[in-house]
Amino acid sequence: MKTMMKEMLLALGMMLNVVVCQAQNTVSRLSPENGATEVNIDTHLTMTMSDDAVIGQRGSVSVYDKKTGRLVDRLDMSIPAGPTKGQPNHPTAQYTPVPYRYRSQNITNRNTKAGTPSGVNVWDTGRYQLDIIGGFSDGFHFYPIIAHGRQLTIYLHHNMLEYGHEYYVTIDKGVVEGFDGMKGKKAWTFRTKETAPDRSQRLLTVSADGKGDFSTLQGAMDFIPDSVASAQDGYRVLVKNGDYEELVYFRNKRFVTIEGESREGVLIHYPNNEVFNPHPADIKTNEVKGTFPSRRAAFAADNCSDLTLRNLTLRTDCKGQAEGLLVNGERNYFENVHIIGDGDALQANGSCYWMNCRIDGGGDTILGRGPSFFNHCTITSYGTFMWIRNTEENHGNVFVDCHLKGLSEYAEIGRLPDNKGKNYPHAECVLLNCTLEDIPARGWGTIDDSAKTATILEFNSHDTDGKPVDTSGRNPLMRQLNPIRDAELIGRYSDSHWVLRW
């Protein structure tokens, strides 16, 4: 009997041991590898676990300078990443009384406290993760760790690592469920490259595998100086095929070309929207020129001019008011770029030329003050394609030889409802020789009285078989152009130089 009892207890112990072992999650791969050298200063830290990873809500990830023992960066996992509910309306919120100043200063997490107001807004007292990106001192909410299956990516605060330093990483128990953590100076070490790229070459390579000058696009853009004087002094950034899950924001850049290896192969994306990174509660944003910058886009080029973006896919991974791309500036050119967002998938303020681009959105898919010239672009939308907000100072949106595909019965070409007591009487939309697919016969949605002076023109719209679209049911404010009577006007709108003034 005693022998049988011992055997039963032994078997039970073995079973419990198996359960305990199965509950443990261990590291099967580190990147950078332990002891790695020649690491880029903008590197993410990734861990591949033995089992699917679940992120915890306690403990910290810490990075130390190995030589001095100085704490370089710390991610406190007890702090929530960002808001999950929209902020309440602020009845006294207003546009900034003076234009927002885009100062060219070296503002980073190393020399400035994230959350420092950059304008007339008040301090944000919310207790969320904050990271200064692209010199925006107010900071962005961010996810310190993102998990996809067995892989964990750790996002250090930007610009904390330096060239020619050796670092070690510690991870507390609780940061990852079922993982005992990582302790000591030898568990995970790496050394960064000795020197920065040669600025005189003006050619930078970004590669997600760490084999380029930078591992992230943000790292490359941070390296490029502000307001380059001429095209001859401009920079070219080549982005290798890869998955770049990063929030990209840069400002004050000029004469920069960002070119991907291929549109399908380069994906730059992040889970961002107006809820996660809202505008300051006391400030209105996005509506008028010179107001406080938006932080809700996955990719934002702010106060930038003479940019070229080519062969990239830009995507937000969130629903709601969520741009895949937000651009503010003049004379910006986009070719073969795929933009994926939800509401306001593309926000374009300032003159932009779009060549052979694809834009996919959920509604008000194209937003902004314009002017924008779309040439051979494809746009899909579940809701209204655009909400144009240009003033009399410039043209609005012009589409030439484009394809608009509706994905629901609500996919009207545009709308102009009153917006919090105001409207856009000078709004302009022109469609020339466009393919319209599954667009409601009425064409346009709501146009309130205060916007009935808007310019809405259409010429030679046809279906996917090349047959003319029946425009008899169009909104009466949508004017159909005649090839003979309106030949001069059609010619003008077909000319990007006339529309964009460059």
Where are these regions (language model features)?
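Bacterial N-terminal signal peptides that target proteins for export
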Residues: 2-9
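Small side chains
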Residues: 13, 59-61, 260
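Acidic, low-complexity Ser/Thr/Gly/Pro-rich repeat segments typical of extracellular/periplasmic
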Residues: 24-197
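Bacterial N-terminal signal peptides
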Residues: 10-17
